[in-house]
Amino acid sequence: MDFIKRTFPMLFGIFLLSVLVRLPQLNRPLSKHHEFCTAISLRVMQIWYDNGIENYGYNPVMTFNTPADKFINNSANQSGRMIDKQGNYYYVSHPPFAYYFPFFFFKLLHIRPDVLPLQILNMLFHFISGLFVYFTVCLLSFNRARSLPYRSAVVAFAIYMFMPVTLWFQGNVYMSDMAVHLLFIIGVYTALKMIIRRRFYSPKYIFFYCLTLALMIYTSWLGVFFAFGVLVYSLLHVRGELKGFRVLIWSTLIILLVMLRLIVYQYSQINGVSAYVEEMMGRYIIRGSLEETDQGLWHFMFSYLWLVKTLIYNYVMHYIVIYAAIGAFMWLAISRKKLKIVFSENGYRFIWLSVMPVVLLHVFFLNYSVQDFSALYASLFFSVLAGILYDKVKKSGAIPIRTMQVSLVAVLLLMVAQYELMNMPNAFSKQQQKLMGEKIQNSAGADEVIFSSYELLEPQAIFYAHRNVKYAKDKAEAIEFLKATNRTKGVFLELRDNKEYVKVVERFSIDSINQQ
């Protein structure tokens, strides 16, 4: 009852402050800093909502339902083979659960998927993630989460709430990459609690762990690396004093194999197993760690090191304030004898479960990891570490409590300032992609296939246009596409970089061309 009456209101109040910080960024046109992810997610969900998810085999479709939009691949898949007989393209780089939950949640509430509802849901995920950060610190500190507020856990929660990486990617940006983060945090907490509290044989904990792992794998590939991390740790300790790791091993193996089989089966229904395998191999070449191996060893090594540099840069940019705070703690530990850096066995367990899957993801998917949203996954480790270090300093008495409180407020304010600097308005209009999309929509009839020689059309513009746009270098190529797909009318548009410029160059039809 203490948690409901005192702790929860306090934590929710801190969360509301984080929402207040983000208010200027909410419910505006999608425009920047990976908001193309939100545009892709909403395109999938809106097509399902308008036309019925069952008509697409419950798969993430990227083709609008207008007949003129069929057979057009806009940011859908690499190989071009993930297409059904009706001409619908599908996005299969990730499993589909990240789209399912918001879609069915909005469907239940009779809300059409759109920017603000999805942002609100994403911030709710942010709050739930923070709660499990709080629970994790309580678990590691042997404090009951259901009792009075535990100060160090509150610190970890507050740090997590105001990290620039969580403020943005659990607010404005939503896709599988962000949705899996909540499940990852819950998974780490559940596995850690099974080990620390020795709940290996508890049906409740086994069920909750298996459910979390299954949904994690069904959301994004971080779930696979988490499963691998749990397996390796369990195998290393299966013959130790702590019995029960065989339960974790078999539970993890069964869930991993079942979910991978389900994903392959589901996506193979679109256009066969070979098409799906080809698509995933192509995606791995692009997003994995082996791109440009055909260019020679030295070229590959230079490219690899450049990607590592970018990854390090992303971590510095998102966690520089946290690094400074940890650096201050290290200085205190070195300069004052009564403050020692000692981690318990449970601390090392947490480090393994929270860090190993992220490291594996970066190693095997380096090209993917240089997208800075992958730095989100480290927020669990850094926020819990901040809470534990705060607890160590407080117990040592090396710094007065008042000074620690002022320092915490300073850290939070610095992180908010960093968030504002990273996401401040740039030279491009926030309305740009929306205006371009609306002009594209108004420039073509429902029976006209839209063509353009512009190669850099963003997913945001496609989302606001509610139309697919086919790339063609000229009119002749456009006419060839019309004939190949049995369509008769087309319109060629001129689009320009960084402007809301949309101009109708020419309208044409197969019938009029045949008559000439």
Regions flagged by a language model, labelled:
Residues 14, 154-160, 208-211, 249-253, ...:
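Transmembrane alpha-helix segments characteristic
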Residues 19-24, 163, 223, 389-392, ...:
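Transmembrane alpha-helical segments
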Residues 33, 38-117, 285-294:
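Interfacial juxtamembrane loops and adjacent helix segments
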Residues 170, 177-185, 225, 349-353, ...:
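Hydrophobic/aromatic-rich transmembrane helices and adjacent perimembrane loops
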Residues 190-198, 209, 213, 225-256, ...:
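Perimembrane helix-loop-helix junctions
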Residues 223, 229, 246-327, 358-361:
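Membrane-lumen/periplasm interface segments of specific transmembrane helices
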Residues 227-228, 426-430, 442-476, 480, ...:
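Short periplasmic/luminal acceptor-recognition loop of GT-C membrane glycosyltransferases, typified by
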Residues 235, 313-345, 356-359, 386, ...:
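Hydrophobic, aromatic-rich transmembrane alpha-helices
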